[in-house]
Amino acid sequence: MAVSVADRNSFTYICAMQHITESIRELYKKWKGSAPVSLDVLPQSGSERRYFRLYDNHQSVIGTYGANIKENETFIYFSQQFQQKLLAVPEILAVSEDKQYYLQEDFGNISLLNKLEEGGFTTPVYDLFKKSLEALAKLQVKGDKGLDYEQCLTNKEFGKQAIMADLLYFKYYFLDALRKPYDKQKLMDDFEALSNYLSHTEYKYFMFRDFQSRNIMVKEDDSIHFIDYQGGMKGAPQYDVASMLWQARANLPDAWKYDLLEDYIDAFENTIGQSVNRNIFQNQYNGYVLIRLLQVLGAYGFRGLFERKAQFLTSIPLALTNLKEFYLNQSLGIIVPEFNKVLTLCVADEVIHQFTPVQAHEKTPLVVKVKSFSYRNGVPVDDSGNGGGFVFDCRGILNPGRVESMKTQTGRDKQVKDFLEQQTKMTEFLNSVFDIVDISVEDYIKRDFENLSISFGCTGGQHRSVYAADALVRHLKNKFKVRIELEHLVQDAKNWINASTPSK
């Protein structure tokens, strides 16, 4: 019997994951002397690394698989060096001979960002941010001593070249996409001047590079621990502070930004054992805030405007608002006239409005009805009287139901979601769906229409259509704040209980 491409891909995925988990288990056994009692696959982050939590009866550890051996070596080296100095990083417990697998200390599941989202702008959360910045100062200064920067993953130092790269990233992937007039040569001259100014800082220590609240873990005793610093290099300490305090998703109040910066400078002075010129330190900090904000806009522009990924497009208005708030209230300490002209163009109300979607309000009559269904039962009827709406066929997406371990699961189960996000073209499919649907939703909100029907179908109405319908609901709520009625026709009828039957 012929084997389909879907079957081959499913088999390849299963074999690859089985090999990885077996290798992680074997490394654990060599380290501990016994096999783990259980192993959980953790959600994959933005990188290609895979994480696992391994348990015995008393503790858990994190297992990591990474095909990029250089990246693994950098993280392991930094961790071992920092651990010797009792800094807030995980202990490396074991490393495989091929350096593709390693075990590290487990700090739990709760990040500083989780604490902020749960607790809001409260004193206990502020104290965690302050504690994180105090630990950062120690990591930067003490971690720098004796560190071999030849071990860095990319550049050894965040100097003029790296600063220019971030500025050009913003220029090519966001500024030029606006098609606004500016003097290109004068702007390049200003980029050169700003890069020189920021690279000639008095203080250069270890720079985390991606110091954000999602990379800071908080244990039950409120102790602070850092992860994901393998992109670190030598650089200005202000960059990491700027990354944390101006993280768009955290959206910290101005008072917090000011007070936490003062807290950090106090901690930095205590760590280096001398006072700093706060005016100069603040001006250079402002420069790095700007670099970070522009780098983020470049990333959103590349992912959103060029790759057409909807979630990045919806992030642009907040990033522009952040940039406007900073630009109108802070000084760089350097004269860059064409650069200032460009920033004024970028934060103009018309540009922010250009990227801000129309949103529903309390009196908006529109209700979007989203359904998942099985093609075996036919396309669902639109009972609004409009004769139908969008129907998207998910059967071209590789089917998780062909994998034995996922046959009785649904599009809401973690293993299925991981499979669809990592092993199929579901993300590309949904980005195209979002582009199509957004046009109608925006128009219907403006014109006070009352109904829009959107349905997703697959073979059994269990995996792909369920995942896609849920994803669209999240997208529409986040972007348009519109009222939605969600119905999973097959799963609701079965009370989400699925027998193990063959899928096609």
Explain the meaning of each model-derived region.
Residues 298-359:
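ATP/Mg2+ or Mg2+-diphosphate-binding catalytic cores
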Residues 168-177, 238-274, 290-306, 319-327:
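Active-site activation/catalytic loop segments of kinase-like enzymes and analogous catalytic loops
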Residues 52-165, 176:
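ATP-binding pocket architecture of kinase catalytic cores
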Residues 450-473:
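Catalytic cysteine-centered active loop of the rhodanese-like fold, especially the PTP/DSP P-loop
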Residues 11-101, 205, 219-224, 346-347:
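Conserved NTP-binding catalytic cores of kinases and kinase-like/nucleotidyltransferase enzymes
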Residues 2, 50-54, 139, 194-241, ...:
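Active-site acidic catalytic loop and adjacent metal/ATP-binding pocket
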